[in-house]
Swiss-Prot record:
Ion channel inhibitor. It comes from Cyriopagopus hainanus. Keywords: Disulfide bond, Ion channel impairing toxin, Knottin, Secreted, Signal, Toxin. This is U7-theraphotoxin-Hhn1k. The presence of a 'disulfide through disulfide knot' structurally defines this protein as a knottin. Expressed by the venom gland. The keyword Oxidoreductase does not apply. GO terms for cellular component: extracellular region. GO terms for molecular function: ion channel inhibitor activity; toxin activity.
Length: 90
């Protein structure tokens, strides 16, 4: 009888330790995933901020994104930025 109780208590202790380990691992993975998401968001915000001038007024000497070019559109009397049919390399 004592052996059975000891075995049950020992098994519960092992399960508690394993559960704690899995929980710690899951928390570490969750933190890593959150950091990765924040990095991706920061990168996309930078890219969007750099290229916010689509269809905006421009001149040939103004800086622009690699895939946007300054074109004169008639009958509009100013130049606008349009896509140059290329894709940015990542």
């Amino acid at each position: 009888m004592k052996t059975a109780i000891f075995t049950v208590v020992l098994a519960l202790a092992v399960f508690a330790v394993l559960s704690f380990g899995w929980e710690a691992n899951e928390k570490a993975l969750s933190e890593e995933f959150t950091e990765l998401i924040h990095e991706k968001e920061a990168a996309s915000e930078t890219e969007a901020r750099e290229c916010r001038y689509f269809w905006g007024e421009c001149h040939d000497h103004m800086p622009c994104c690699d895939w946007l070019v300054c074109r004169y559109k008639w009958p509009i009397t100013y130049n606008i930025r349009v896509w140059n049919r290329t894709f940015p390399e990542k």
